[in-house]
C-alpha cells in the first residue's frame, strides 16, 4: 500500500517523458527548507502541467508508477482548490478522472480517494470548497498538509468535525517539522485516525505510548525525511525505533518526482542501510 502520496508529484517520470518528452530531475542532496522544495517544484513542475489535461496526465503517471511498484492500495486525491482550477467546480469530473485512470492503467489497484487541504488557506475558503465534496461516498479520507506552522491546528476543528460526520478517515501532516507534542494535540483536537509523517514522536516516550494506546497509524516517508533534512540518514531513520516499540507504521512515497522515492526503492533503502530487516519490512508491508 502507498497511503502517503501526493499525486501531483507522485508519478512515473518515465511515463511523463514518454507522453511529453519532458524530463523531470529528482533532487540528490538534502534541502535546507520547504522553500527550497517549492523552488524545485516551480522549476520542474511549474506551469508545465497547469491545465486540466496536465492534471490528468499527472494522475495517470501516479497510477503508472504505483502499478510498476506493485502497489495494491493507493490513497491519493485532489486538493480542494483544484476543483475550480481544473475541473470547472464539477465534483463528478474529479471523481471520474481518478476512477477512469485507475480502471484504464491499473485496475488491480484499490483506489482510496482523498480530499486534500492546504494548511495555509483560510478555514472559510476551505469550507466553501468542501461544500462540493461533502456527501460523496467515493471519497475515503481527508488530509491536511503544507506548512505545519502556518496556523493553529485548532482552526481546522469545524472541518474535521464535518469530515467525521461524512464518514471520512481523518488524517493530517503533523510531526514532520513540528514537535512530538504537536502530534498529540492534532490527534486530540481533530480526532485523527492516522498521521502523515509523525516522526517527531520518537522524541517523547509519552507520545509513543499515546500512539500505541490509541491505535494511531503513522504513514512515514523515509527518503523525503532524509532529503528534507528531518533525519540525518536512512540508517538512523526513526521508523525503526517506532516500529520496534509497537507503533503502527506504513511506508509511503510522498513525492516520487522530487525524492526519487518509489515505494520499492523506499523498502530497499531501509533494508540496505540496515535500518530494518527484510522480515520487519515484510511485516510493515503486510500490515499496510
Predicted feature residues:
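Metal-cofactor-binding active-site regions of metalloenzymes
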Residues: 1-168, 177-181, 189-194, 200-217, ...
Amino acid at each position: 500500500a502507498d497511503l502517503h502520496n501526493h499525486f501531483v508529484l507522485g508519478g512515473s517520470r518515465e511515463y511523463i517523458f514518454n507522453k511529453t518528452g519532458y524530463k523531470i530531475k529528482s533532487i540528490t542532496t538534502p534541502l535546507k527548507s520547504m522553500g527550497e522544495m517549492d523552488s524545485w517544484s516551480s522549476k520542474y513542475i511549474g506551469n508545465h502541467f497547469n491545465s486540466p489535461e496536465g492534471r490528468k496526465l499527472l494522475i495517470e503517471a501516479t497510477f503508472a508508477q504505483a502499478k510498476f511498484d506493485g502497489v495494491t492500495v493507493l490513497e491519493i486525491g485532489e486538493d480542494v482548490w483544484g476543483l475550480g482550477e481544473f475541473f470547472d467546480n464539477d465534483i463528478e469530473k474529479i471523481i471520474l478522472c481518478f476512477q477512469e485512470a485507475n480502471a484504464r492503467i491499473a485496475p488491480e489497484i484499490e483506489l482510496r480517494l482523498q480530499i486534500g487541504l492546504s494548511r495555509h488557506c483560510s478555514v472559510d475558503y476551505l469550507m466553501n470548497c468542501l461544500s462540493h465534496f461533502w456527501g460523496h461516498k467515493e471519497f475515503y479520507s481527508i488530509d491536511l498538509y503544507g506548512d505545519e506552522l502556518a496556523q493553529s491546528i485548532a482552526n481546522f476543528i469545524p472541518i474535521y468535525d464535518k469530515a467525521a460526520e461524512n464518514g471520512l478517515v481523518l488524517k493530517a501532516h503533523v510531526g514532520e517539522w513540528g514537535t512530538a507534542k504537536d502530534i498529540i494535540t492534532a490527534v486530540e483536537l481533530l480526532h485523527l485516525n492516522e498521521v502523515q509523517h509523525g516522526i517527531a514522536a520518537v522524541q517523547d516516550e509519552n507520545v509513543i505510548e499515546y500512539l500505541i494506546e490509541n491505535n494511531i497509524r503513522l504513514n512515514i516517508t523515509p527518503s523525503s525525511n532524509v532529503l528534507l533534512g528531518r533525519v540525518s540518514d536512512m540508517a538512523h531513520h526513526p521508523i525503526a525505533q517506532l516500529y520496534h516499540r509497537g507503533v503502527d507504521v506504513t511506508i509511503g512515497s510522498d513525492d516520487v518526482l522530487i525524492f526519487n522515492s518509489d515505494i520499492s526503492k523506499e523498502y530497499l533503502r531501509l533494508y540496505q542501510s540496515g535500518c530494518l530487516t527484510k522480515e520487519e519490512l515484510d511485516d510493515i508491508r503486510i500490515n499496510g
